[in-house]
């Protein structure tokens, strides 16, 4: 999965993208509702000389949660401390991070749904009262002391908000749903990134890259860099529509932003399971992918684009999925040969 050109997750080759990230809300493209709310909340907090209330970003990976955390830290003139749920293994790890913060700092916890429950409970007084409760000693001699913490902002990010416990979720003052980007928004992101990379690109080519980026800025920037490589070798370095299409076709990212694995999922449902319904476990076993990977990585985009439907009985291919392969349901029933073998 990590080697997919259209994986929404951060990979080693994406490190150059850090320089492409906006640093202010004004520079940030997309997520209009989230951006508008954050703009008001940040201005209100600064007007009252208070830290920003705690924020939870949830949604598919690659949509800008970490970027917004950086922007919030910049806007609040605080430092950003970044960690993740799996990285905090002991209560002492979290205590060390919390006591190192200063006023207006931002603590960003990625994959916050993977925090150990016992560690999670340490966050409750930290979020509510800016306090850290420490137990000294053991048994009957144990006693609890409370340390004051600076006025910091906790930003949590998760791709699976349903796995958060209610006590933790309820302590966030702002819950922000991150949505897939429109093709037009991604075009603007590609144009902006190309300018930073000193690459000449026409808007038609930028739109083509954006259209095939699965609604995800991280993928758009990754594809831009690969198209840049292609045009440096095959063209004069400038990216036009013809060069963009040729590069993306060579990368096997089709006009809908689907790659070989996406098409494999659709082919399996249509040609091997008669269009569905098929259970997620069965589908995962058939195509050789982890169940969580299908549910968290592939499905959101396929559902959002209308290729598959999630039903109580399993996954069902839509008419759009059949059209994608140029077949109708009747033709598929007349010829049940898997196109895996073609």
Curated annotation (Swiss-Prot):
Primary location class: cytoplasm
Domain of life: Bacteria
Transmembrane segments: none
GO biological process, one term: DNA repair
Reaction catalyzed: ATP + H2O = ADP + phosphate + H(+)
Binding sites annotated in the UniProt record for DNA: 310, 315
GO molecular function, one term: ATP hydrolysis activity
Name this protein carries in UniProt: Holliday junction branch migration complex subunit RuvB
Source organism (scientific name): Clostridium botulinum (strain Hall / ATCC 3502 / NCTC 13319 / Type A)
Gene (UniProt): ruvB
């Amino acid at each position: 999965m990590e080697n997919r050109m259209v994986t929404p997750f951060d990979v080693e080759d994406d490190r150059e993208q850090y320089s492409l990230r906006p640093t202010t809300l004004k520079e940030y493209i997309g997520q209009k509702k989230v951006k508008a709310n954050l703009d008001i909340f940040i201005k209100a907090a600064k007007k009252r000389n208070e830290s920003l209330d705690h924020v939870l970003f949830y949604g598919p990976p690659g949509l800008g949660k970490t970027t917004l955390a950086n922007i919030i830290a910049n806007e609040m003139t605080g430092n950003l401390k970044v960690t993740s749920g799996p990285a905090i293994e002991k209560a002492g790890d979290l205590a060390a991070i919390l006591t190192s913060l200063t006023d207006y700092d931002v603590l960003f916890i990625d994959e916050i749904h993977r925090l150990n429950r016992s560690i999670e409970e340490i966050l409750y007084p930290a979020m509510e009262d800016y306090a850290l409760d420490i137990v000294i000693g053991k048994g009957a001699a144990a006693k609890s002391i409370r340390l004051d913490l600076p006025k910091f902002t906790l930003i949590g990010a998760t791709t699976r908000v349903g796995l958060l416990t209610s006590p933790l979720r309820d302590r966030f003052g702002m819950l922000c749903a991150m949505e897939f980007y429109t093709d037009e928004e991604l075009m603007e992101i590609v144009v902006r990134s190309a300018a930073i990379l000193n690459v000449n690109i026409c808007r038609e080519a930028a739109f083509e890259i954006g259209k095939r980026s699965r609604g995800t800025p991280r993928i758009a920037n990754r594809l831009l860099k690969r198209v840049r490589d292609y045009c440096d070798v095959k063209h004069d370095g400038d990216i036009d529509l013809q060069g963009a299409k040729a590069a993306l076709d060579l990368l096997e990212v089709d006009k809908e932003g689907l790659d070989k694995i996406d098409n494999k999922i659709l082919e399996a449902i249509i040609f091997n399971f008669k269009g569905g319904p098929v259970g997620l476990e069965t589908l995962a076993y058939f195509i050789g992918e982890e169940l969580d990977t299908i549910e968290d990585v592939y499905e959101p985009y396929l559902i959002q684009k209308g290729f598959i439907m999630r039903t109580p009985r399993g996954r069902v291919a839509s008419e759009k999925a059949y059209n994608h392969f140029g077949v109708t349901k009747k033709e598929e029933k007349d010829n049940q040969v898997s196109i895996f073998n073609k």
